[in-house]
């Protein structure tokens, strides 16, 4: 896939697109060499002071280090691994064990991403071991470094050709085919979870919400971003399938083509209304998968007539419209599968079944079946760090 296989020319694509690191980079660029760095723990570790945040990694991550992003979980820096000569994105998850839900999310992300091995799924390059096993509160995960994400591209005034959008869609589906074949649902696909580099390679990231495909408990922990949420999730269906990710892909692709969110709902009720205004009120036959409460709720809503996608989005290729309509189907049982989406005429120029691998061993969520304490989760993450750094065994 390395930018070949029908990839559009990428030279100018990322030029204007504000990359993930744009803002912090500008703040830091002035004194990038001046980010204070101190060797610690007998020179085995190095501490950086990033805007008042202590960032402590193994000494192989030499200066300079660059802040590239910030989130609720903590801070992300690009760093250079002097042993592998690779630039990576190191995410610090501060106070990772303060509550069980966050700790489990971090453990899930690590185990899942380490299990995956695919060009369109971001890879973990390292988990930094803690300097002291007994005081282990922050987790540092090093991922392969990408240039930007789809959210930044959509927000920028970077011109995107039809070929670019098509190639991004193809890569999302190619990665999703692999993820689903591992018996995993991503459950939180959105533009900011799709990373890109200057070569137009796309990688899916953030598996903290992922679930096994056969699991039926409703999402109790975190709220998936509403705008990309399938109707069955909005209606609290506990019996959701891989089709939830396909719905999200349809929303993302139309946002890419239209440069604005397809269904920017303000709340649950508004979200459902927006999608029905476009795809129409579902028929009785389409309600079969819902529980009685959800059916009753739908029946009392105003009747919406389905709009013509072709008329609403005249600038979008008719074959792309056909594929999106099959993705944005209300009834998940009728929604197109990832395999069939890859084989759709719109993607003929890119589709190559011999180059769309599946995962040979399904992922096991067994570690979630036990009520693990924070200490047990800490121990499991510590072991994951040692798998990358056996010499740090304490």
Curated annotation (Swiss-Prot):
UniProt xrefs under Pfam families: Pkinase
Cofactor: Mg(2+)
Residues carrying Phosphothreonine: 220
Limits of the Protein kinase domain: 62-347
Post-translational modification: Dually phosphorylated on Thr-220 and Tyr-222, which activates the enzyme.
Molecular function as annotated in GO: ATP binding; MAP kinase activity; protein serine kinase activity
InterPro entries: Kinase-like_dom_sf, MAP_kinase, MAP_kinase_CS, Prot_kinase_dom, Protein_kinase_ATP_BS, Ser/Thr_kinase_AS
Residue window of motif TXY: 220-222
Keyword Ribosomal protein in record: no
Active site: 188
Enzyme class of the recorded protein, top EC level: transferase
Family, per entry: Belongs to the protein kinase superfamily. CMGC Ser/Thr protein kinase family. MAP kinase subfamily.
Record-given protein name: Mitogen-activated protein kinase homolog D5
Organism expressing this protein natively: Pisum sativum (Garden pea)
């Amino acid at each position: 896939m390395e930018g070949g296989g029908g990839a559009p020319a990428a030279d100018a694509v990322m030029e204007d697109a504000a990359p993930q690191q744009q803002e912090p980079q500008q703040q830091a660029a002035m004194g990038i060499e001046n980010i204070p760095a101190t060797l610690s723990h007998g020179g085995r570790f190095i501490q950086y002071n990033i805007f008042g945040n202590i960032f402590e990694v193994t000494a192989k991550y030499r200066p300079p280090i660059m802040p590239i992003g910030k989130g609720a979980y903590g801070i992300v820096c690009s760093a250079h691994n002097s042993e592998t000569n690779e630039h990576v994105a190191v995410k610090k998850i501060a106070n990772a064990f303060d509550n069980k839900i966050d700790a489990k999310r971090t453990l899930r992300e690590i185990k899942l991403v380490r299990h995956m091995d695919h060009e369109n799924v971001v890879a973990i390059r390292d988990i930094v071991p803690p300097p002291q096993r007994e005081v282990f509160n922050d987790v540092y995960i090093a991922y392969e470094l990408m240039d930007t994400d789809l959210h930044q591209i959509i927000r920028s005034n970077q011109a995107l050709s039809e070929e670019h959008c098509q190639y991004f869609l193809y890569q999302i589906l190619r990665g999703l085919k692999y993820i689903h074949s591992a018996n995993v649902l991503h459950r939180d696909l959105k533009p900011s979870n799709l990373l890109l580099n200057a070569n137009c390679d796309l990688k899916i990231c953030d598996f903290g919400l992922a679930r096994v495909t056969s699991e039926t408990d409703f999402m109790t922990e975190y709220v998936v971003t509403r705008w990309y949420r399938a109707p069955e999730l909005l209606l609290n269906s506990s019996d959701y399938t891989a089709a939830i990710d396909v719905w999200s892909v349809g929303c993302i692709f139309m946002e890419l083509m239209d440069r604005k969110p397809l269904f920017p709902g303000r709340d649950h009720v508004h979200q459902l209304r927006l999608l029905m205004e476009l795809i129409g009120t579902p028929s009785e036959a389409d309600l079969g998968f819902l529980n009685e409460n959800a059916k009753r709720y739908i029946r009392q809503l105003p009747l919406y007539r389905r709009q013509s996608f072709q008329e609403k989005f005249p600038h979008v290729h008719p074959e792309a419209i056909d594929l999106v309509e099959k993705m944005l189907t209300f009834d998940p049982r009728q929604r197109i599968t990832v395999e069939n989406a890859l084989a759709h005429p719109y993607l003929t120029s890119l589709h190559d079944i011999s180059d769309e691998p599946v995962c040979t061993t399904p992922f096991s969520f067994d570690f979630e079946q036990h009520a693990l304490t924070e200490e047990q989760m800490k121990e499991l993450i510590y072991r994951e760090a040692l798998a990358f750094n056996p010499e740090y065994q304490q």
